[in-house]
Amino acid sequence: MNIDIVCVGRIKERYLTDAIAEYSKRLSRYCKLNIIEVADEKTPEHASEGVGRQIKAKEGERIAKHLKDGAFVIALAINGKQLSSEELAAKINDLGLRGTSHIQLVIGGSIGLDDAILRRADFLLSFSKMTFPHQLMRVILLEQIYRAYKINAHEPYHK
């Protein structure tokens, strides 16, 4: 399975890059992982709704350039469907059984994803009704993908 994480912005914090590197290494046993970073837009403090839409549109255009025909696109969105770890594992397994060989997971920037990306997605996934920093979300997402593969392989890790 090919899995792309398409995300906005670069991560500068060492503790996050270390965690991303660790989960990327662990996942290499199970899938071909590719992390694609697109440039983020500077978001002014107290940006108006209109400015926010413009920022999301620019970031959305950059994301869209990396979305592949035939890939199953999962966008992370607060209004998406919440799944348990077991349900995410089953979803990944089912996609593979149905012949999907490429999954792309999209993480928006600090103000979220453009509506065009949300419409393009095949599935909207929410990790919580809470908001998380988009940089930290990469680590959380990678850990859950790793957990899903361990569940599907019936290997110890998941409790």
From Swiss-Prot:
Positions in coiled-coil regions: none
Domain of life of the organism encoding this protein: Bacteria
Signal peptide stretch: none
Main localisation: cytoplasm
Subcellular location: Cytoplasm
Primary enzyme class: transferase
Protein name: Ribosomal RNA large subunit methyltransferase H
Binding-site list for S-adenosyl-L-methionine: 76, 108, 127-132
Catalytic activity as recorded in UniProt: pseudouridine(1915) in 23S rRNA + S-adenosyl-L-methionine = N(3)-methylpseudouridine(1915) in 23S rRNA + S-adenosyl-L-homocysteine + H(+)
Sequence similarity: Belongs to the RNA methyltransferase RlmH family.
A Pfam short name: SPOUT_MTase
Assembly and oligomerization: Homodimer.
EC identifiers of the protein: 2.1.1.177
Function summary: Specifically methylates the pseudouridine at position 1915 (m3Psi1915) in 23S rRNA.
Keywords attached to this entry: Cytoplasm, Methyltransferase, rRNA processing, S-adenosyl-L-methionine, Transferase
An annotated Gene Ontology molecular function: rRNA (pseudouridine-N3-)-methyltransferase activity
GO CC annotations, alphabetized: cytoplasm
